[in-house]
Amino acid sequence: MIYPLSIRSFFCSRVITAVLLALLFTGCSENSAPDTETQNREITMNELAERYVKLTLAVGQHHDYYIDAYYGPEAWREQDKQPLGELLQLGENLHADLAKIDATNHEKSRHEFLTIQTESVLFFIKHLQGEQFSFDEESKALYDAISPTIDESEFDQALAELDDLLPGDGPLNQRMAVFSKQFEIPKDKLDTVFRAAIKESRQRTRQFIDLPTQENFTLEYVTDKVWSGYNWYKGNSFSLIQMNTDFPITIDRAIDLASHEGYPGHHVFNSLMEKHLVNANGWIEYSVYPLFSPMSLLAEGSANYGIDVAFPEHERIAFEKEVLFPLAGLDSSKVDLYYAVQAVRSKLSYIDNVVAKRYLDGQIDKQTAQQMLMKYALSSEQKALQRIGFIEQNRAYVINYNLGQDIVRDYVEQLSKGNAEKRWQVFSELLAYPKTASMMRH
């Protein structure tokens, strides 16, 4: 407390007296035994976890989208807004105390994960304070990974393949738009197709993963978003899944979104963490999900890779041709060419990272970024602008989809060694007991 100048003199003599008394008793206290309860008591992981949750919730008061999900004590959310400087100090204290912990084998992974998550919180606070960082510095600090450097010549090779598959006049992105139009799901069939895709992905996931009996979701259709789909996890194994209908949705996106947002993607990931870590183990730090953190690389990477786990290529093609195409009222006569085109397009996925890095690092302007997305992502003008909006809002987060998928795939495939049942086992264990990118690469 800072006292007003007008009453300062009132306390002068008392302050001097207090100082003298403190000096008088210093010799008596120097060699006295410390209170073991308050001074030497070991800090527990659960105490540090509670501090971490409260810290991330407090940071969330400074950014509308930082807290993606929270289902811990409601009272912890209802705290006064604290200055960023104070939060940075709290975070640094937490990080220092984590470094003092000698984690047992049982809690070693828990300790490592919480430490890396805490480091990302510290970085995000500095970002909110206005500190400037490069794209790679941001992705490393927030997501524990750096996207590889890819030469544009690699993308050009994929474009040449697509040019052969889709011959004709005009820019390639326009030819792609014309070709893809015949595979767009009519708006009045969207709900039917999506629910069929979700039902199938749910059944396939349940064969290998023991989901909570009460797990469920609500499906909504929205507009005017920078994303194509979103899972809002509410706790108790319940999700609100939203699909953005701003742009036409092609038939292949039904399984993509059903699996990514639902099964075995985000909905399953959050449900398993809540079931095994929060409810069974009492590890409260997993009750909060800060969006801009290493957890998101696993979340997005596993949601993308999970599509292939649930739907191996030949099974996916069969289900789409036999079930989804008829439900959408689409002609499947050119489906083989469509899948060939999609396979080549997948080689272009890292263009998002290249464009985001150059744009956010100030190497290119918005117009150039749009042109690059139109050329290499084969986007329309409007779709390219939507993607730039996503990049502006979420910045280095874009690496989590492609790089995250590759890191998760490498981890799971290395341990499962091509065995389909083992793949499900390793994959589900990774969702239930999360690892950051560097932990997966150990």
Segments predicted by a language model, with ranges:
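N-terminal maturation segment of proteins
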Residues: C28-H442
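Bacterial N-terminal signal peptides
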Residues: V15-T26
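N-terminal secretory signal peptides that target proteins for export/translocation
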Residues: M1-C12
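Generic secretory/membrane-interface signal
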Residues: F11, L24-F25, P294
